[in-house]
Each structure stands twice: as C-alpha cells, then as structure tokens.
Amino acid sequence: MSASVQSWTDRLDGAQAADVSALLGRATAADGTAPVSEQGVHAVSGAGGDGVRHLVETDADRIVGYAQLQPGHGEHPAMAELAVDPEARGRGIGGRLVAEVLSAGGPDTRVWAHGNLPAAQAVAQRLGLTGARELLQLRRPLAGAELPELVVLEGISLRVYRGVEDDPEVLRVNAAAFAWHPEQGSWTEREMAERRAEAWFDPAGLFMAFATSDEKRLLGFHWTKVHPKQGDEPAIGEVYVVAIGPDAQGRGLGRLLTLAGLHYLRDRGLGAVLLYVEGDNASALHTYDRLGFERFHTDVAYARA
C-alpha cells in the first residue's frame, strides 16, 4: 500500500473539483447524509467561500480524503468539514484530516460531523474533542397529514419574492436575525445570486412578511427549497431559511411564515419536509414541535476540550 500525501490549496483546479465532488457523492451514498454543507459544496466549485482553504489527501494520484477550512472572523471560530472515500476508510485518513485542519485553523477551530456517525465519534474521542455545537435536522410528513390553517395576522401582509429588487431587504433581515451565526449571517448578494441560479430556486417559494403600514420594510421571510428525488429517496421539501428581524420578533411571524411555506410545499405534492435548527434554539424548537416536527438526525461541531 502506498503512502498517502496531504496538500493544501486556496483553490481546487477543475480536475480536483470534479474528483472531490465525486468523492462527496460516494460518501453521501454510503452514509446516507452529505459530509459537506451546501455552502461547502459551492466552495468546492469555486463559486463561493472567500478565504476557504482546501486540503486533499491523495494516494497514487487519487483523492482519498478531502477537507475544507473556512477561516474564522470576528468572534466566530474557523469551521471545517471533511469526507473520506468509502473505499479508503479504516486507514486513519479521517483522523489525519481532522488533526491537520485543527492545527491550521487555530485553537478554537470546530470540525463538523454531519450525522455524527460512529466513525466521526471515534475520531473525536481519540483526539480528545468535545461537541461544541449541535445542528438538528427535524422532519414532518405533509402527505396525509393535517396542517393548521394559514391565517394572516392582522396588520401583516404576505407576498412572494419579486426579484433582485427585494435582495437588500432580505439580506438586511438575514444579517440581523443571524448575527450570531458564523455561516448564515454573513450572506451577501453573491450568496443570493448563487441560490437564484440553482435548479431548485422558485420565487413562489420565498415568502415575505411586511406591516400593512409599511410595505417597504421587511419584517421576516421564509425561503423554501425542494430536494429532487435521488434513487429510491423521494423528493422532499425544506424549510430552508426562516428569518425574523429582531424588532419584529415575538409577534407570531415565525409560525405564520413557516406555515405559509408548509402549505406551499404540500400543494406541490411533496410527502415530507425537513429543516435544520440549532440545538440550543429553544424558541424555534418550541415552534417546530407545535407544528409536528420530530428529530431525524444530528450534526455536531467538535472542538478541542
């Protein structure tokens, strides 16, 4: 067996990006969960991710392991994600990748384990890491399941996204609502444009709430998403982003906007819907529990103890 080699790069070339994308696909098929987030997938192709560094581990010129490191900014630590080719597992590649990104990213670096699979838990234990953040995936059925009636609150108007003219308000509310969030809170027009270019994008699935007294200042929005059928897995909807401006919270807008999206997804014929929520977001968890969502799996960000 030949010795594998690690190397860092600020940008993957075309062949590397294709090989990494294929590796991520194999890992997803083997594990039942994607090892890298949507933002990370964009960074692989070079479409996004300022400052992202890529670590590849090769064996005989074949990429057998991949990690990416998103630099820290302000109070937010550096974040890393990684994947090991299913055919190359059991050789310590995952542990080496984690050790290297922790060294490169600094003492507060966090490493995502999507699905928190047993192999990831074993690496974390071996390296003395502890869970620093949890991201929960919740799901609920749509087909054959009741949804509360959608009743628009008094003094509130709902409409859908009209195009780039809405972007400044969407980005303003997003930044304010997710100021604490190292990934979501840093969105710019580039992230908006990337998502508008995706095959799943549908302006009719982005719901926006305004006060009837001021229909230029956005109070909150709910962006839905549809994941297409993959193999035996049917298409599924997603509560992609729900953002409520700090000055509009506590008025029931989160529930209203979520329900608007759920009705839309059900009307499209989808059988189920998923969402992601921080494990310590008690308010959101309470809202989603009342709407019939249940925990499906957990992503854990590990850090040095």
Curated annotation (Swiss-Prot):
This is Mycothiol acetyltransferase. It comes from the Bacteria. Catalyzes the transfer of acetyl from acetyl-CoA to desacetylmycothiol (Cys-GlcN-Ins) to form mycothiol. One of its GO terms (molecular function) is mycothiol synthase activity. It holds the Pfam family Acetyltransf_1. Its EC number is 2.3.1.189. Acetyl-CoA 1 binds at L82, A83, V84. It comes from Rhodococcus opacus (strain B4). Belongs to the acetyltransferase family. MshD subfamily. Acetyl-CoA 2 binds at residues 242-244, 249-255, 281-286. It is an enzyme of class 2 (transferase). It catalyses: 1D-myo-inositol 2-(L-cysteinylamino)-2-deoxy-alpha-D-glucopyranoside + acetyl-CoA = mycothiol + CoA + H(+). Keywords: Acyltransferase, Repeat, Transferase.
